[in-house]
Amino acid sequence: MTNIRKTHPLMKILNNAFIDLPTPSNISSWWNFGSLLGLCLIMQILTGLFLAMHYTPDTSTAFSSVAHICRDVNYGWIIRYLHANGASMFFICLYTHIGRSLYYGSHTSQETWNIGVLLLLMVMATAFVGYVLPWGQMSFWGATVITNLLSAIPYIGNTLVEWIWGGFSVDKATLTRFFTFHFILPFIITALVAVHLLFLHETGSNNPTGIPSNMDTIPFHPYYTIKDILGALLLILTLLTVTLFTPDLLGDPDNYTPANPLNTPAHIKPEWYFLFAYTILRSIPNKLGGVLALLLSILILLFIPMLQTSKQRSMMFRPLSQLLFWTLIADFLILTWIGGQPVEHPYITVGQLASILYFLLILVLMPVASLIENKLLKW
């Protein structure tokens, strides 16, 4: 008798995606982050759903409703902090996933890569509107500052900002629509994840060598299901440790003060996962220039497949490119650090140099290094 998982229309799809999927036999733990991102998404949707049952998207009660969740709702505090720190874990996995794809040349699968970049943008949008919901000081001023950047667009800027706000300032209408977006976006992300996987399974997974592995594959289950479960356990352990011991480690103390339009916090800054882009924005003294650089700092990922000049897919056997890749990672960390510092000397200069290096590495140095490596290998 034929196995039901191979004949049933629905089971067949799941079987071909998670059970009998031919997978390269040599993929390392860096390939775990895709499944971890799926786990993060599920956790965020579930915790978010329970939070939405008790949250009220109204300027007069939003802050109190979050306090009510933490104080009065059964296990509300852990749901709230799992959701807040879950977002941080989500971005750690996202950035690692992107870094792995860059290192091993996964961006040569262009459709998968482009949908991945779109997913990154949507997760960033979701995190931004979500940060506004507790209606603390940093929520309010973060929303004001970031939405205000759109006013740099010539001709339509101011109208666009007022349209997004639903008035002449960040107020009740803004909070309501941000809650709506925060609720709907994760479901759109889930649909895009399915498309991301669809395109990935068209070509099959890449592997550390970057060489086609069609002749050396093993079934996904049980080998990689076990490996993914180990990764999932480590992720959950880390998340629970942070949530139970230092829940506010990655948050901002200013957000425990209710939003006050008459009092600006000393240092307005976003959550840690946006700090690298925030530094690039601050590094340019011109408003429109800063906004364009901010956009380009993320959209530059779309140009990476076009900048692939190496004849080898992976960086595994390319020491020069490896050096530049790790320089890029260090630069990303420096940008993140600078974003959390006040706008004063020497942070301004360091931020500007790190911003220049960021674009220089991706657009010039890495493609040139690849060409040099081609020459050295007489390719």
UniProtKB/Swiss-Prot annotation:
Keywords recorded for this protein, A-Z: Electron transport, Heme, Iron, Membrane, Metal-binding, Mitochondrion, Mitochondrion inner membrane, Respiratory chain, Transmembrane, Transmembrane helix, Transport, Ubiquinone
Q: What species does this protein belong to?
A: Delphinapterus leucas
PANTHER family reported for this sequence: CYTOCHROME B
Complex formation: The cytochrome bc1 complex contains 11 subunits: 3 respiratory subunits (MT-CYB, CYC1 and UQCRFS1), 2 core proteins (UQCRC1 and UQCRC2) and 6 low-molecular weight proteins (UQCRH/QCR6, UQCRB/QCR7, UQCRQ/QCR8, UQCR10/QCR9, UQCR11/QCR10 and a cleavage product of UQCRFS1). This cytochrome bc1 complex then forms a dimer.
Q: Return the CDD domains for the record.
A: cytochrome_b_C (cd00290), Cytochrome_b_N (cd00284)
Query: What is the UniProt remark on how the cofactor binds and its stoichiometry?
Result: Binds 2 heme b groups non-covalently.
**Similarity annotation:** Belongs to the cytochrome b family.
Q: Which GO terms describe its cellular component?
A: mitochondrial inner membrane; respiratory chain complex III
Q: Any extra detail in the entry?
A: Heme 1 (or BL or b562) is low-potential and absorbs at about 562 nm, and heme 2 (or BH or b566) is high-potential and absorbs at about 566 nm.
The UniProt entry, under Gene3D superfamilies, shows: Cytochrome Bc1 Complex, Chain C
Positions annotated to bind a ubiquinone: H201
Q: Which GO terms describe its molecular function?
A: metal ion binding; ubiquinol-cytochrome-c reductase activity
A GO BP entry: mitochondrial electron transport, ubiquinol to cytochrome c
Location(s), subcellular: Mitochondrion inner membrane
The record's listing under PROSITE patterns reads: CYTB_CTER, CYTB_NTER
Q: What does this protein do?
A: Component of the ubiquinol-cytochrome c reductase complex (complex III or cytochrome b-c1 complex) that is part of the mitochondrial respiratory chain. The b-c1 complex mediates electron transfer from ubiquinol to cytochrome c. Contributes to the generation of a proton gradient across the mitochondrial membrane that is then used for ATP synthesis.
The membrane topology of this protein is:
Multi-pass membrane protein
State the name under which the record lists this protein: Cytochrome b
Positions that bind heme b b562: H83, H182
According to its UniProt record, which cofactors does this protein need?
A: heme b
> Where exactly are the transmembrane stretches of this chain?
33-53, 77-98, 113-133, 178-198, 226-246, 288-308, 320-340, 347-367
